[in-house]
Amino acid sequence: RSYIERHGLRWSVVESLPVTETIKYGGPDRDEQIEIYKQSMRNLAAEGIHTICYNFMPVLDWARTDLMHPNADGTSNLYFSFAHFAYFDIHILKREGAVEDWRKFKIEGVERDILAEVETIRQTMTQEQEQQLIENIVIKTQGFVSGNFKEGEKHPVELFRRLLALYKDIDTDKLRENMKYFLSAIMPVCDECDI
């Protein structure tokens, strides 16, 4: 905070205060985890932070397929490629139903032959590039946000699969129900702390 303030800025938003997987899928220690979350909210409010963002997506938070995407002017930025993410889903994660899900893929209502793009990637993807894609999607972005993954994780894809398996019986309605439960539990703290 002092570093930010020394440079003329004010810390006013936290993005993101991670919601644990057990809260999202409704695990046995959900209420305990919600209490921890509520205390974190109180702690942030006590420091003058009254805007807290969160994510309720299973396993993934924000994901990027390239952390150093080159721009024409020589700079770089974070980048997300649906085709590379689909490649990860189909050929690395090997998620059941992935091919069918991507076959029906649309962006803003426009169909896109993502499977043809995935095939092009598959034909040119090196082992090093595949490892970098795993690093970017699983370790770098998810480890940073959720703490579920750590640098040096020996089997990140297997861990990713195990976490995803926790949602096997969680459909959209159940996830929405779990989110409603979470929000109902934290709203009194939002009111109490002006969040």
Language model features with spans:
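Asp-box/BNR beta-propeller blade signature and adjacent active/binding-site loops
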Residues: E5-S12
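A cross-family glycoside hydrolase active-site/sugar-binding cleft signature
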Residues: S12-E15, C53-N55
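Active-site acidic/histidine proton-transfer and metal-coordination neighborhood
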Residues: I23-I195
